[in-house]
Amino acid sequence: MAAHDSGRLSVSLILMQGSAEAQATLDVLEQEDPTLVIDDHGTFWKITSPTGHIEVDMERVSEELGVEISLSQWLVIMSSYIGRVHTEPGKFTLTSDVTELHRV
């Protein structure tokens, strides 16, 4: 399977705690993907997908937050990641699959 070509399947997203935007993101991700493993490190959350795919939809985060948030605004609270990134105007995708990025 192509997702395993790199030898890495899981991907992780690091979100700094303390903002409504981060909490809204966490809430949306928990609702949309129950397979995610969320570790609370006190000042940040490490969100890991054992399936190799995390997608953050800014429209969903905006709905949860109650105000519109753009990808560029959201990137300020996203501290780091482990995996490959693809962005669209309203979406942040983290994947372990190189070929997925080439299909977009």
Predicted regions and their residues:
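Generic alpha-helical secondary structure signal
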Residues: 20-23, 72
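Short, surface-exposed ligand-recognition loops at beta-strand->loop->(often short) alpha-helix junctions
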Residues: 13-21
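Short, intrinsically disordered, mixed-charge
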Residues: 27-35, 63
